[in-house]
Amino acid sequence: MADFKPLRVAVVGCGNISGAYGSSLKTKPDVVQIMGAFDVLTDQAKAFANNYGGRVYEKLENVMADPEVELVINLTSHHAHAEVSSMALIAGKHVHSEKPLSTKREDGKKLLELAEKNKVRLSCSPFTFLGESQQTVRKVIHDGVIG
């Protein structure tokens, strides 16, 4: 049986949700290794790296060029998801994006095509903002059943 090597990840976007990801990743050092973090607000990337490990990438391009990074976890603002994920896929990195995958349907299709073309995986967190539960609540309120 071959030795299992942890998946080497970089986090891009170190806002509020990054703490939940960092805490979870840190509990599985045999499965994932945090290589570093990037954020346009460098202090946020520094805080993430101090709390969860890895280096601070000064530029987004440095994350994409790092041959040690196998997976990019995209936690950027919604409007940046497609661009950041696209860069990572083109660089041959697997991508896990926080929801939504993209803000435009055509961008989402392009991401799927890039993942297939570059033989890498693309995943996205469950869509909860406008999920079934929220739609049911909205309908019940709209229909006057409650509220």
Specify the residue positions occupied by each region the protein language model found:
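Short, well-ordered coil/turn segments that N-cap beta-strands
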Residues: V32, K93, V120-R121
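Short loop/turn motifs at secondary-structure junctions
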Residues: V31-I34, E68, V145
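Short, Asp-centered acidic motifs that coordinate Mg2+ and/or phosphate
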Residues: G36, E70-L71, R121
